[in-house]
Regions:
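Non-catalytic substrate-recognition/targeting regions of SAM-dependent transferases
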Residues: 1-18
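Non-catalytic surface loops within mature trypsin-like serine protease
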Residues: 5-7, 112, 155
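Preference for short coil/turn "hinge" residues that link or interrupt alpha-helices
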Residues: 8, 17, 31, 131-134, ...
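A short alpha-helix capping/helix-coil boundary motif
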Residues: 8-9, 96-101, 152
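Residue-level marker of regulatory loop/turn positions in helix-turn-helix DNA-binding domains and
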Residues: 21
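Conserved S-adenosyl-L-methionine
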Residues: 24-142, 158, 164
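C-terminal catalytic and target-recognition region of SAM-dependent MTase-like enzymes
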Residues: 137-187
Length: 187
């Protein structure tokens, strides 16, 4: 027996209509954010933010936003489950959101279209006010004291030529300085 309760795959949280090349799945990003231990008072930075997935998932974690809050499920159409059950579950999830958290996120990307994409996705996700995003190359990046850096740089033949990749990784090595106070997670 097979019942599709979800409809669209659960890795789609409902906030990302558009993305850039080779985006990370929201669920994978959420798992990495968990490993990075982003909390309500964290400052999270993604110096190559692309469509903003790490920043948004960090905000969701820090603010206690339920991951499926902004999406619909196939089971919502089932007559066996009253519509009030879905409404009540969403209301409960909305009440659980920590709107007072000091969480902040900063995103940078060399591509101004990616910056705009991140802003749009964050707004759709309801966390736009917690993110600051600007166009900037990794070579200009300065570590923000006390921050958690999470980055998924373009890699391999899917995005860069070998020479470009080597140059990018060299810049990353010069600009990203992980420490106990400033952990860095690179995929």
């Amino acid at each position: 027996i097979y019942l599709d309760t979800s409809g669209v795959g659960l890795h789609k949280r409902g906030y990302r209509r558009n993305s850039n090349d080779a985006p990370i799945k929201e669920t994978l990003a959420a798992g990495i954010v968990d490993l990075a231990r982003a909390r309500a008072d964290s400052v999270v930075v993604d110096p190559m933010c692309g469509s903003g997935t790490f920043l948004i998932e960090s905000a969701y974690k820090a603010l206690k936003v339920a991951p499926g809050l902004r999406r619909n499920f196939a089971a919502e159409q089932w007559s066996q489950i009253p519509e009030t059950a879905w409404r009540n579950a969403r209301a409960e999830a909305m009440d659980a959101i920590d709107r007072q958290g000091a969480f902040k996120a900063f995103g940078f990307d060399v591509d101004d279209m990616a910056v705009e994409l991140t802003r749009n996705n964050a707004k759709k996700a309801g966390v736009g006010s917690k993110l600051t995003v600007k166009q900037q190359d990794i070579s200009k990046y300065s570590q923000i004291e006390g921050s958690i850096t999470i980055v998924n740089p373009p890699y391999g033949e899917r995005m860069l030529e070998i020479k470009e990749a080597e140059e990018l990784y060299k810049k990353m090595g010069q600009r990203l300085c992980p420490s106990k106070e400033n952990p860095c997670y690179i995929i």
